């Protein structure tokens, strides 16, 4: 009789994805981040579920309900700390995962890459609506500023904003629907993740060389299950350390003040993981232009597979493009720094230059470098 994991209709799916999956023998630690993102998602759904049991999505009680969770609920402080800092780790893993994909040419699996960008947008939307829920000053004003961007849409902008607000300002209706969205989206993300994996397993994983690895595959279990477990241990240790020793390190002090529509905080800024996009938004003095730049700063990833000009897949053997890739990493870090700075000289011009370099690298410099490397190597 055949092994149950190979014959049972449900176990067979899990077996083909996690046990007998043929994986390249040379994939490095950069391939760990997919499973780490899965771990982050499970952690966020689990902690979020327990928070939702005690949270109330009403402007009169939202802030105090979060305080109640931290003070009166058994280990509520820990659950909230893990959930809030888990979001930061989620984005660290996402950005490293995307960076890996860009460096090693994994984006040439177009379907997997496209659904990955959709996943990024979903996670960003989830994090945004989640940040509004504690109903602190930065929650309220962040929601006001970001939802107001939709008013830049020609003709229907104003109506669209009021439709999302559920009134004429960010109010109770807004908070209630944001809570509903924040509860729903993680399950949509989980479903999209399954599709992401489905497309990945159609082609198999890429590897650091970017070459075909069909001749040298190893089973996923035990080799990569144990390798992933090491990653899990590192991530959970880091998350627990941050949540226990310095839970408010990445938060904004303004969010310890209950939301007040009559008092605007001196500097409205999002969480650190959105600062690069926020800097790009602010670098354009026109409202509609800024909104389009903000959207395109993420959607430019969709174009990457179509702008691949090199005959080689990975950057492993392409020093010129490697330099441009690390320039992009440095540029995103500069944008992140600028996004948290006030709108004044010299930060404005630095942000504008960094935004220009960001788009130039994706759309012009990296594709041109690919063509140049082909020519140097004499590849037609």
Curated annotation (Swiss-Prot):
Question: Which sites bind heme b b566?
Answer: 97, 196
Q: Which residues bind heme b b562?
A: 83, 182
User: GO annotations under biological process?
Assistant: mitochondrial electron transport, ubiquinol to cytochrome c
Report whether Heme shows up as a keyword of the record. Answer: yes
Comment on bound cofactor: Binds 2 heme b groups non-covalently.
What is the designated name of this protein?
Cytochrome b
Gene Ontology terms: cellular component: mitochondrial inner membrane; respiratory chain complex III
Q: What domain of life does the native source organism fall in?
A: Eukaryota
Question: Where does it reside?
Answer: Mitochondrion inner membrane
Which SUPFAM superfamilies has this protein been placed in?
a domain/subunit of cytochrome bc1 complex (Ubiquinol-cytochrome c reductase) (SSF81648), Transmembrane di-heme cytochromes (SSF81342)
Organism the protein comes from: Kareius bicoloratus
Matching entries from CDD domains are given as: cytochrome_b_C, Cytochrome_b_N
Tell me the cofactors it needs: heme b
Q: Name one Pfam family in it.
A: Cytochrom_B_C
Q: How does the UniProt record describe the way this protein sits in the membrane?
A: Multi-pass membrane protein
Q: Which gene encodes it?
A: mt-cyb
- Kindly give any further remark recorded in the entry: Heme 1 (or BL or b562) is low-potential and absorbs at about 562 nm, and heme 2 (or BH or b566) is high-potential and absorbs at about 566 nm.
The record describes its quaternary structure and partners as: The cytochrome bc1 complex contains 3 respiratory subunits (MT-CYB, CYC1 and UQCRFS1), 2 core proteins (UQCRC1 and UQCRC2) and probably 6 low-molecular weight proteins.
**What this chain does, per the record?**
Component of the ubiquinol-cytochrome c reductase complex (complex III or cytochrome b-c1 complex) that is part of the mitochondrial respiratory chain. The b-c1 complex mediates electron transfer from ubiquinol to cytochrome c. Contributes to the generation of a proton gradient across the mitochondrial membrane that is then used for ATP synthesis.
What taxonomic lineage is listed for the species of origin?
Answer: Eukaryota, Metazoa, Chordata, Craniata, Vertebrata
Entry GO MF terms: metal ion binding; ubiquinol-cytochrome-c reductase activity
> Where are the bilayer-spanning segments?
33-53, 77-98, 113-133, 178-198, 226-246, 288-308, 320-340, 347-367
Sorted UniProt keywords? Electron transport, Heme, Iron, Membrane, Metal-binding, Mitochondrion, Mitochondrion inner membrane, Respiratory chain, Transmembrane, Transmembrane helix, Transport, Ubiquinone
- Say which family it is in: Belongs to the cytochrome b family.
The residues that the entry says bind a ubiquinone are: 201
């Amino acid at each position: 009789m055949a092994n149950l994991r190979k014959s049972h209709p449900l176990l067979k799916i899990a077996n083909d994805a996690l046990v007998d999956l043929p994986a390249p023998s040379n994939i490095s630690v950069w391939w760990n981040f997919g499973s780490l993102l899965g771990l982050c998602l499970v952690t966020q759904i689990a902690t979020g579920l327990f928070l939702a049991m005690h949270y109330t999505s009403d402007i009169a009680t939202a802030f105090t309900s979060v305080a109640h969770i931290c003070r009166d609920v058994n280990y509520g402080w820990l659950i909230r700390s893990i959930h809030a800092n888990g979001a930061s780790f989620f984005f660290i893993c996402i950005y490293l995962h995307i960076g890996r994909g860009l460096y090693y040419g994994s984006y040439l699996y177009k379907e997997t890459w496209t659904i990955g960008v959709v996943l990024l947008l979903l996670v960003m939307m989830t994090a945004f609506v989640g940040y509004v829920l504690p109903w602190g000053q930065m929650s309220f004003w962040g929601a006001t500023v970001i939802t107001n961007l939709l008013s830049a849409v020609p003709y229907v902008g104003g109506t669209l904003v009021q439709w999302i607000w559920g009134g004429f300002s960010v109010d109770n209706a807004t908070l209630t629907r944001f809570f509903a969205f924040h509860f729903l989206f993680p399950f949509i993300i989980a479903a999209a993740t399954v599709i992401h994996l489905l497309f990945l397993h159609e082609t198999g994983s890429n590897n650091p060389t970017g070459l075909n690895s069909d001749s040298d595959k190893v089973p996923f279990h035990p080799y990569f299950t144990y390798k992933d477990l090491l990653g899990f241990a590192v991530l959970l240790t880091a998350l627990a350390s941050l949540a226990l020793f310095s839970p408010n390190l990445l938060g904004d002090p303004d969010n310890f003040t209950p939301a007040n529509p009559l008092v605007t905080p001196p500097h409205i800024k999002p969480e650190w993981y959105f600062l690069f996009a926020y800097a790009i938004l602010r670098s354009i003095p026109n409202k509609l232009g800024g909104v389009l730049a903000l959207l395109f700063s993420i959607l430019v990833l969709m174009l990457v597979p179509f702008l691949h000009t090199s005959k080689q897949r990975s950057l492993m053997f392409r020093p010129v493009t490697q330099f441009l890739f690390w320039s992009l990493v440095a540029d995103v870090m500069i944008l992140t720094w600028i996004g948290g700075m006030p709108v004044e000289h010299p930060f404005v011009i630095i942000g504008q230059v960094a935004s220009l370099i960001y788009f130039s690298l994706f759309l012009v410099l990296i594709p041109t470098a690919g063509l140049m490397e082909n020519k140097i190597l004499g590849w037609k």
